[in-house]
């Protein structure tokens, strides 16, 4: 009985973290299913209003992703920059925030602030307030300097070793997209 209870508890914890990093439902371009290098979909205010109108949907938020690298003097690491906008629900990240704060993410300007996991910060010898250089390969290499505003720790290594959170605006600019273009929409039910 104890073993079954432990397995059920572990399964529930993993499920909650996967949903916390993503959502119950993601609407995205079909070409993006197996890659973090995504093709945009157009999501305007009318679509956000329509999706929010379903009684089963408790929250809707847009997101965009951009794979890249973090580089310090001593190391480099692959990562995915996930941009979220003002409708971002910070409750999941707030639960796992160990240092700093969650910035007020925007879709119309970049704060150049980022949330990074404790695992990545430790691996890269980074701390709260540090400036980090991130690099993105497209037709040419593009670099951005970001400031670590917060450090989170979920102990879910598949995500902790990969994701940095920042403004939707910054990620869309890196992707060369228009304001209504995003990687997808996340729905909580």
Question: Where are the regions that the model predicts?
Answer:
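A short beta-strand structural signal in non-transmembrane regions
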Residues: 25, 120-121, 180-189
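Short, strongly hydrophobic transmembrane alpha-helices
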Residues: 1-9
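Membrane-interface junction motifs in transport/secretion proteins
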Residues: 11-44
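Structural beta->alpha junctions
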Residues: 31-37, 153-155, 187-189
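Conserved residues at the C-terminal ends of beta-strands
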Residues: 28, 63-66, 188
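A structural signal for hydrophobic secondary-structure junctions
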Residues: 41-180
């Amino acid at each position: 009985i104890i073993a079954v209870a432990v397995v059920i508890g572990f399964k529930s914890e993993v499920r909650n973290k996967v949903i916390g990093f993503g959502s119950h439902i993601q609407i995205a371009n079909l070409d993006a299913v197996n890659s973090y290098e995504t093709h945009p979909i157009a999501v305007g205010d009318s679509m956000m209003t329509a999706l929010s109108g379903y009684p089963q949907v408790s929250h809707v938020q847009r997101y965009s992703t951009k794979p890249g690298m973090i580089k310090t003097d001593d190391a480099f690491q692959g990562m995915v920059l996930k941009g979220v906008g003002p409708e971002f629900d910070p409750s999941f990240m707030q639960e796992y925030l160990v240092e700093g704060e969650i910035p007020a993410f925007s879709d119309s300007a970049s704060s150049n602030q980022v949330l990074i996991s404790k695992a990545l910060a430790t691996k890269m010898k980074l701390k709260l307030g540090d400036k980090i250089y991130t690099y993105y390969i497209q037709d040419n290499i593009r670099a951005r300097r970001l400031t670590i505003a917060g450090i989170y720790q979920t102990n879910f290594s598949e995500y902790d070793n990969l994701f940095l959170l920042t403004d939707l605006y910054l990620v869309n600019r890196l992707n060369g997209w228009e304001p209504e273009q995003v990687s997808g929409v996340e729905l909580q039910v």
